[in-house]
Curated annotation (Swiss-Prot):
Sorted UniProt keywords: Amino-acid biosynthesis, Aromatic amino acid biosynthesis, Cytoplasm, Transferase
Subcellular location field: Cytoplasm
Annotated positions binding 3-phosphoshikimate: 15-16, 20, 169, 171, 195, 319, 346
GO cellular component: cytoplasm
Family annotation (Pfam families): EPSP_synthase
Cysteines engaged in disulfide bonds, as pairs: none
Protein name: 3-phosphoshikimate 1-carboxyvinyltransferase
Species whose genome carries this gene: Chloroherpeton thalassium (strain ATCC 35110 / GB-78)
GO molecular function, one term: 3-phosphoshikimate 1-carboxyvinyltransferase activity
Keyword Magnesium (UniProt): no
Positions annotated as active site in the UniProt record: 319 (proton acceptor)
């Protein structure tokens, strides 16, 4: 059995937080310094698009005291409405976060903009982007299928909105917040199922708990945002792959440093503990409103399959589900998931992608509209198994982890998507591996 060992400071910076620090920096009055900004392609796309809109952005690399490379981003802005019209279409590449959240800002600008992406992004649904922004007064045009390109004719100022978020989506919530910052009045967002709350924490928005358990977020429009520094923790979604690596080994000794432990992002740790893992955390502290700490995987493993049948839990672990599904199947032969239809609208139809590739590894799967289950394994194939990644970084990394514990040689049909969020994925695992 392979083992993996070491203390690691160089996990990728949090992808979600990196996007939001850059976007908020572009809306803030003054100089925003972001320490440990992500080098992933999605986050670099956000910077590139903001630069195309006239935002002054400088980026430099430096070595930490531990000898690891980090990036520092400095954004200079004069606040709301400081963007300028781009002379060309804005290329968002594969970044759904960029195209969706930026739409909320562009809806408030007094000019026309067109947002496009790569072949994968151009298939992703965007009607949930258009609906609230249209209600606020912007003109939004999509393709006939409701996908990009997104053509935005902004309105200054936007009208405030009372937005009830029927389908949980942190990106849609954030784009409405960004639009509401420019609105002429007070906007409210009602969130029945909580999604990741990084945007609210950065902007100092404190949700009001309602009698029915939902949360109300109140946004005052046209209020000056003063620039402030941000420090980005290590990405808990990226850490999940290394947690799974250690748990599948059962004999590893791994410490993952400075990982974000925000309760809306690290819910997978609680699930894995319920399945038998220990997974203690140490050195917990709060920086800029975000909880972070070190995750320990030491001679640890799960003893029970994961069964996920709660919409709030699904919202909390939406990005980790591919790795959790593969981990549970490989470790116990079983897995069950419901209330996760949102997975079909990610970089790929992740439900279909997981079922297809798990079946290639001999697992018995049943696919539902909102999830799937694994009910056993008919055989453990040998030889070479090709995994269809659908150019989805989380599918690619999940099955790359499985490859370390499979009788078959697992080959990814494409591993270039991994650079979207975890550029040093393979080199980091190589540095951990002891045979």
């Amino acid at each position: 059995m392979k083992t993996f060992n070491g203390t690691f400071f160089n996990l990728p910076p949090d992808k979600s937080i990196s996007h939001r620090t850059a976007l908020i920096g572009a809306l803030s009055n003054g100089i925003t310094e972001i320490t440990n900004y992500s080098a992933g392609l999605d986050n670099q796309t956000t910077l590139s698009v903001l630069q195309s809109l006239g935002v002054d952005i400088q980026q430099e690399s430096f070595l930490t005291n531990d000898g690891y490379e980090q990036r520092k981003v400095v954004i200079k802005s004069s606040g709301l409405w400081s963007l300028s019209r781009s002379k060309r279409e804005l290329m968002c590449n594969n970044s759904g976060s960029t195209i969706r959240m930026l739409s909320g800002i562009l809806a408030a600008q007094p000019f026309r903009t067109t947002l496009v992406g790569d072949h994968s992004l151009m298939k992703r649904p965007m009607r949930r982007v258009a609906e609230p922004l249209t209600q606020m007064g912007a003109s939004i045009k999509l393709s006939e299928t409701g996908a990009p390109p997104i053509e935005i004719e902004g309105k200054k100022p936007l009208s405030p909105i009372q937005f009830y978020q029927k389908i949980p989506s942190a990106q849609v919530k954030s784009l409405v917040i960004f639009a509401a910052l420019h609105a002429d009045g007070i906007s409210e967002i009602i969130e029945p199922i909580q999604t990741r709350n990084h945007t609210e924490l950065m902007l100092g928005l404190e949700p009001e708990l309602q009698p029915d358990g939902s949360r109300k977020i109140v946004i005052e429009g046209q209020k000056n945002i003063e620039a402030k520094p941000f420090t980005v923790p290590a990405d808990p979604s990226g850490a999940c792959f290394l947690v799974a690596l250690g748990l599948l080994s059962g004999k590893s000794d791994i410490r993952l440093k400075n990982v974000g432990l925000n309760h809306t992002r690290a819910g997978y740790l609680s699930l894995l503990r319920e399945a038998g893992a220990k997974l203690p955390t140490e050195n917990n502290r709060t920086i800029g409103g975000e909880l972070l700490g070190d995750i320990i995987i030491s001679n640890d493993y799960i003893t029970k399959p994961l069964r996920i049948n709660d919409a709030q839990i699904v919202s909390d672990i939406i990005d980790e589900i591919p790795m959790l599904a593969v981990l549970s199947a490989m470790a116990t032969g079983e897995f069950e998931l419901h209330h996760a239809a949102e997975l079909r609208a990610k970089e790929s139809d992740r439900i279909h992608a997981l079922v297809m590739n798990l079946q290639r590894l001999g697992f018995v799967c049943e696919e539902y509209k909102d999830g799937f289950c694994v009910t056993g394994r008919t055989h453990n194939p040998t030889g070479t198994i090709e995994i269809t990644t659908f150019y989805d970084h989380r599918i690619a990394m999940s099955f790359a982890i499985a490859g370390h514990f499979s009788n078959a040689e697992i080959q990814l049909d494409d591993n270039s998507s991994i650079a979207v969020s975890f550029p040093n994925f393979f080199s980091l695992i190589d540095s951990m591996q002891k045979t």
